[in-house]
Protein backbone atom coordinates (compact mmCIF):
# COMPACT_ATOMS: atom_id res chain seq x y z
CA UNK A 1 0.00 0.00 0.00
CA UNK A 2 1.28 3.49 -0.88
CA UNK A 3 1.27 5.93 2.02
CA UNK A 4 1.55 9.71 1.99
CA UNK A 5 1.20 12.56 4.43
CA UNK A 6 -2.57 12.68 4.05
CA UNK A 7 -2.95 9.00 4.96
CA UNK A 8 -1.26 9.68 8.30
CA UNK A 9 -3.11 12.90 9.00
CA UNK A 10 -6.48 11.38 8.11
CA UNK A 11 -5.76 8.41 10.35
CA UNK A 12 -5.00 10.81 13.21
CA UNK A 13 -8.18 12.77 12.56
CA UNK A 14 -10.13 9.51 12.73
CA UNK A 15 -8.32 8.32 15.88
CA UNK A 16 -7.41 5.16 13.93
CA UNK A 17 -4.41 4.00 15.93
CA UNK A 18 -4.05 0.72 14.01
CA UNK A 19 -3.73 2.56 10.72
CA UNK A 20 -1.34 5.07 12.27
CA UNK A 21 0.85 2.20 13.46
CA UNK A 22 0.76 0.61 10.03
CA UNK A 23 1.75 3.84 8.30
CA UNK A 24 4.57 4.55 10.75
CA UNK A 25 5.95 1.02 10.47
CA UNK A 26 6.06 1.33 6.69
CA UNK A 27 8.53 4.19 7.02
CA UNK A 28 7.03 5.84 3.95
CA UNK A 29 5.27 8.79 5.55
CA UNK A 30 6.94 11.99 6.72
CA UNK A 31 5.73 12.28 10.30
CA UNK A 32 6.31 16.05 10.32
CA UNK A 33 4.52 16.80 7.05
CA UNK A 34 1.63 19.26 7.09
CA UNK A 35 -1.90 19.21 5.71
CA UNK A 36 -3.48 21.98 3.63
CA UNK A 37 -3.92 24.01 6.82
CA UNK A 38 -0.18 23.64 7.52
CA UNK A 39 -0.80 21.52 10.59
CA UNK A 40 1.05 18.32 11.45
CA UNK A 41 -0.35 15.04 12.68
CA UNK A 42 0.94 15.88 16.17
CA UNK A 43 -0.85 19.22 16.20
CA UNK A 44 -4.11 17.56 15.21
CA UNK A 45 -3.74 14.81 17.80
CA UNK A 46 -2.95 17.43 20.45
CA UNK A 47 -6.19 19.28 19.65
CA UNK A 48 -8.24 16.10 19.73
CA UNK A 49 -6.85 15.04 23.09
CA UNK A 50 -5.75 11.52 22.20
CA UNK A 51 -2.72 11.02 24.45
CA UNK A 52 -2.00 7.53 23.12
CA UNK A 53 -1.65 8.85 19.58
CA UNK A 54 0.40 11.83 20.74
CA UNK A 55 2.82 9.47 22.49
CA UNK A 56 3.02 7.24 19.44
CA UNK A 57 3.84 10.17 17.17
CA UNK A 58 6.47 11.62 19.52
CA UNK A 59 8.05 8.19 19.99
CA UNK A 60 8.37 7.96 16.22
CA UNK A 61 10.10 11.29 15.80
CA UNK A 62 7.37 13.93 15.63
CA UNK A 63 8.87 17.38 16.20
CA UNK A 64 7.19 18.87 19.28
CA UNK A 65 8.31 22.42 18.42
CA UNK A 66 7.51 22.57 14.70
CA UNK A 67 5.18 25.47 13.82
CA UNK A 68 2.08 25.80 11.66
CA UNK A 69 1.82 28.50 9.00
CA UNK A 70 0.82 31.04 11.68
CA UNK A 71 3.43 29.89 14.14
CA UNK A 72 1.36 27.64 16.40
CA UNK A 73 2.91 24.58 18.01
CA UNK A 74 1.34 21.35 19.24
CA UNK A 75 1.68 22.66 22.80
CA UNK A 76 -0.26 25.80 21.90
CA UNK A 77 -3.03 23.71 20.37
CA UNK A 78 -3.21 21.43 23.40
CA UNK A 79 -3.27 24.42 25.76
CA UNK A 80 -5.95 26.22 23.80
CA UNK A 81 -8.17 23.14 23.63
CA UNK A 82 -7.85 22.35 27.33
CA UNK A 83 -5.88 19.11 26.93
CA UNK A 84 -3.96 19.10 30.23
CA UNK A 85 -2.55 15.56 29.97
CA UNK A 86 -1.14 16.31 26.55
CA UNK A 87 0.26 19.64 27.70
CA UNK A 88 2.15 17.83 30.45
CA UNK A 89 3.41 15.11 28.12
CA UNK A 90 4.63 17.58 25.49
CA UNK A 91 6.46 19.70 28.06
CA UNK A 92 8.06 16.59 29.53
CA UNK A 93 9.23 15.70 26.04
CA UNK A 94 10.90 18.95 25.10
CA UNK A 95 8.14 21.34 24.05
CA UNK A 96 9.24 24.96 24.41
CA UNK A 97 6.80 26.72 26.77
CA UNK A 98 7.88 30.27 25.91
CA UNK A 99 8.05 29.98 22.13
CA UNK A 100 5.74 32.49 20.41
CA UNK A 101 3.49 32.30 17.36
CA UNK A 102 3.55 34.82 14.52
CA UNK A 103 1.27 37.16 16.49
CA UNK A 104 3.71 37.10 19.38
CA UNK A 105 1.45 35.01 21.59
CA UNK A 106 2.99 32.44 23.91
CA UNK A 107 1.52 29.14 25.02
CA UNK A 108 0.35 30.82 28.23
CA UNK A 109 -1.78 33.27 26.27
CA UNK A 110 -3.14 30.46 24.09
CA UNK A 111 -4.26 28.69 27.27
CA UNK A 112 -6.61 31.61 28.01
CA UNK A 113 -8.43 31.44 24.70
CA UNK A 114 -11.04 28.73 25.25
CA UNK A 115 -13.52 30.28 27.69
CA UNK A 116 -15.67 27.11 27.58
CA UNK A 117 -12.97 25.25 29.52
CA UNK A 118 -12.26 27.80 32.25
CA UNK A 119 -11.59 25.26 34.99
CA UNK A 120 -9.24 23.29 32.76
CA UNK A 121 -7.49 26.45 31.57
CA UNK A 122 -6.75 27.36 35.20
CA UNK A 123 -4.99 24.04 35.65
CA UNK A 124 -3.06 24.42 32.40
CA UNK A 125 -1.97 27.98 33.17
CA UNK A 126 -0.81 26.96 36.64
CA UNK A 127 1.14 24.04 35.16
CA UNK A 128 2.77 26.27 32.54
CA UNK A 129 3.78 28.83 35.17
CA UNK A 130 5.16 26.10 37.42
CA UNK A 131 7.28 24.94 34.49
CA UNK A 132 8.78 28.27 33.56
CA UNK A 133 6.21 30.18 31.52
CA UNK A 134 6.87 33.93 31.47
CA UNK A 135 3.79 35.28 33.24
CA UNK A 136 4.30 38.87 32.07
CA UNK A 137 5.02 38.17 28.41
CA UNK A 138 3.04 40.24 25.92
CA UNK A 139 1.70 39.60 22.45
CA UNK A 140 3.21 41.60 19.59
CA UNK A 141 0.17 43.34 18.17
CA UNK A 142 -1.63 44.73 21.22
CA UNK A 143 1.11 44.34 23.80
CA UNK A 144 -1.34 42.71 26.20
CA UNK A 145 -0.28 40.39 29.00
CA UNK A 146 -2.20 37.36 30.21
CA UNK A 147 -3.47 39.48 33.12
CA UNK A 148 -4.81 42.15 30.77
CA UNK A 149 -6.53 39.57 28.60
CA UNK A 150 -8.15 37.83 31.58
CA UNK A 151 -9.21 41.18 33.07
CA UNK A 152 -10.83 42.25 29.81
CA UNK A 153 -12.64 38.92 29.43
CA UNK A 154 -14.09 38.78 32.93
CA UNK A 155 -12.24 35.68 34.11
CA UNK A 156 -11.89 36.52 37.82
CA UNK A 157 -10.40 33.20 38.91
CA UNK A 158 -7.73 33.45 36.22
CA UNK A 159 -6.96 37.02 37.27
CA UNK A 160 -6.52 35.82 40.85
CA UNK A 161 -4.29 32.93 39.78
CA UNK A 162 -2.07 35.19 37.69
CA UNK A 163 -1.68 37.83 40.39
CA UNK A 164 -0.99 35.21 43.04
CA UNK A 165 1.77 33.84 40.80
CA UNK A 166 3.46 37.19 40.28
CA UNK A 167 1.69 38.92 37.39
CA UNK A 168 2.42 42.64 37.43
CA UNK A 169 -0.77 44.24 38.71
CA UNK A 170 0.69 47.73 38.93
CA UNK A 171 0.94 50.29 36.16
CA UNK A 172 4.39 49.17 35.05
CA UNK A 173 2.86 46.78 32.53
CA UNK A 174 0.83 48.56 29.85
CA UNK A 175 -0.32 47.54 26.39
CA UNK A 176 0.49 49.50 23.22
CA UNK A 177 -2.21 52.06 24.08
CA UNK A 178 -0.95 52.44 27.63
CA UNK A 179 -3.78 50.46 29.20
CA UNK A 180 -3.32 48.47 32.41
CA UNK A 181 -5.27 45.43 33.55
CA UNK A 182 -7.34 47.72 35.81
CA UNK A 183 -8.25 49.92 32.86
CA UNK A 184 -9.49 46.91 30.93
CA UNK A 185 -11.62 45.69 33.84
CA UNK A 186 -13.03 49.19 34.41
CA UNK A 187 -13.85 49.65 30.74
CA UNK A 188 -15.73 46.35 30.76
CA UNK A 189 -17.55 47.25 33.99
CA UNK A 190 -16.35 44.17 35.84
CA UNK A 191 -16.64 45.32 39.46
CA UNK A 192 -15.31 42.12 41.04
CA UNK A 193 -12.12 42.18 38.99
CA UNK A 194 -11.75 45.92 39.61
CA UNK A 195 -12.03 45.31 43.36
CA UNK A 196 -9.49 42.51 43.31
CA UNK A 197 -6.96 44.47 41.27
CA UNK A 198 -7.28 47.58 43.45
CA UNK A 199 -6.94 45.48 46.60
CA UNK A 200 -3.85 43.90 45.03
CA UNK A 201 -2.18 47.26 44.53
CA UNK A 202 -3.25 48.43 41.07
CA UNK A 203 -2.71 52.16 40.50
CA UNK A 204 -6.16 53.78 40.29
CA UNK A 205 -4.68 57.00 38.90
CA UNK A 206 -2.59 55.47 36.12
CA UNK A 207 -3.14 57.00 32.68
CA UNK A 208 -3.00 55.65 29.14
CA UNK A 209 -1.13 57.24 26.23
CA UNK A 210 -3.88 59.84 25.75
CA UNK A 211 -4.01 60.70 29.43
CA UNK A 212 -7.22 58.81 30.18
CA UNK A 213 -7.51 57.53 33.74
CA UNK A 214 -9.34 54.46 35.02
CA UNK A 215 -12.17 56.72 36.22
CA UNK A 216 -12.49 58.32 32.80
CA UNK A 217 -12.75 54.91 31.13
CA UNK A 218 -15.54 53.85 33.50
CA UNK A 219 -17.33 57.19 33.08
CA UNK A 220 -17.15 57.03 29.30
CA UNK A 221 -18.60 53.50 29.29
CA UNK A 222 -21.29 54.25 31.87
CA UNK A 223 -20.25 51.91 34.67
CA UNK A 224 -21.64 53.62 37.78
CA UNK A 225 -20.86 50.80 40.23
CA UNK A 226 -17.22 50.79 39.18
CA UNK A 227 -17.07 54.57 39.48
CA UNK A 228 -18.50 54.47 43.01
CA UNK A 229 -16.00 51.83 44.07
CA UNK A 230 -13.03 53.69 42.61
CA UNK A 231 -13.97 56.95 44.32
CA UNK A 232 -14.96 55.44 47.66
CA UNK A 233 -12.10 52.94 47.92
CA UNK A 234 -9.34 53.92 45.56
CA UNK A 235 -8.34 57.51 46.42
CA UNK A 236 -8.95 58.39 42.81
CA UNK A 237 -8.47 61.93 41.50
CA UNK A 238 -11.99 62.96 40.44
CA UNK A 239 -10.77 66.02 38.55
CA UNK A 240 -7.87 64.47 36.65
CA UNK A 241 -7.60 65.64 33.03
CA UNK A 242 -6.63 63.74 29.91
CA UNK A 243 -4.36 65.20 27.21
CA UNK A 244 -7.31 67.10 25.72
CA UNK A 245 -8.26 68.55 29.09
CA UNK A 246 -11.34 66.37 29.54
CA UNK A 247 -12.37 65.11 32.99
CA UNK A 248 -14.50 62.12 33.97
CA UNK A 249 -17.44 64.50 34.50
CA UNK A 250 -17.08 65.85 30.98
CA UNK A 251 -17.01 62.33 29.55
CA UNK A 252 -20.16 61.31 31.44
CA UNK A 253 -21.91 64.56 30.55
CA UNK A 254 -21.07 64.24 26.86
CA UNK A 255 -22.17 60.59 26.79
CA UNK A 256 -25.49 61.36 28.47
CA UNK A 257 -25.09 59.41 31.72
CA UNK A 258 -27.19 61.48 34.10
CA UNK A 259 -26.79 59.22 37.15
CA UNK A 260 -23.02 59.29 36.78
CA UNK A 261 -23.05 63.07 36.39
CA UNK A 262 -25.13 63.40 39.58
CA UNK A 263 -22.79 61.11 41.49
CA UNK A 264 -19.61 62.83 40.31
CA UNK A 265 -21.06 66.22 41.24
CA UNK A 266 -21.91 64.85 44.71
CA UNK A 267 -18.28 63.78 45.01
CA UNK A 268 -17.10 67.32 44.30
CA UNK A 269 -16.18 67.00 40.68
CA UNK A 270 -15.32 70.49 39.41
CA UNK A 271 -18.33 71.51 37.30
CA UNK A 272 -16.73 74.63 35.81
CA UNK A 273 -13.34 73.26 34.83
CA UNK A 274 -12.61 73.71 31.10
CA UNK A 275 -11.00 71.41 28.55
CA UNK A 276 -8.38 72.49 26.02
CA UNK A 277 -11.11 73.91 23.78
CA UNK A 278 -12.57 76.00 26.58
CA UNK A 279 -15.61 73.75 27.04
CA UNK A 280 -17.16 72.82 30.40
CA UNK A 281 -19.28 69.79 31.31
CA UNK A 282 -22.34 72.00 30.78
CA UNK A 283 -21.21 72.92 27.28
CA UNK A 284 -20.72 69.24 26.48
CA UNK A 285 -23.95 67.97 28.08
CA UNK A 286 -25.93 65.56 25.94
CA UNK A 287 -29.38 66.20 27.44
CA UNK A 288 -31.50 68.83 29.16
CA UNK A 289 -31.67 66.61 32.23
CA UNK A 290 -27.91 66.72 32.62
CA UNK A 291 -27.80 70.45 31.91
CA UNK A 292 -30.37 71.00 34.65
CA UNK A 293 -28.36 68.92 37.14
CA UNK A 294 -25.25 70.95 36.38
CA UNK A 295 -27.01 74.33 36.50
CA UNK A 296 -28.54 73.52 39.90
CA UNK A 297 -25.06 73.01 41.28
CA UNK A 298 -23.72 76.27 39.90
CA UNK A 299 -22.45 75.34 36.46
CA UNK A 300 -21.95 78.31 34.16
What is the predicted function of each stretch?
Residues 19, 52-53, 86, 120, ...:
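Conserved ankyrin/ankyrin-like repeat signature
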Residues 31, 64, 97, 135, ...:
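Ankyrin-repeat inter-repeat connecting loop/turn
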Residues 4, 38, 71, 104, ...:
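Start-of-repeat signature of ankyrin repeats
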Residues 265, 270-300:
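Leucine-rich solenoid repeat scaffolds
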Amino acid sequence: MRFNRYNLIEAVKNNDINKINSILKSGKADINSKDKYCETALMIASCKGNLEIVKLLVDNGADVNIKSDIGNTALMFASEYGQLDIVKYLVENGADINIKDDAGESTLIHALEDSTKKEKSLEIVQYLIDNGADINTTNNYYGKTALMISSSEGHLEMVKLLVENGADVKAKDKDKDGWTALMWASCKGDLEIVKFLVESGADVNAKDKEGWSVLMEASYEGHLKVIKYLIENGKVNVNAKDDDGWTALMRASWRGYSEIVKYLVEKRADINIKNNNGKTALDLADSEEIKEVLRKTGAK
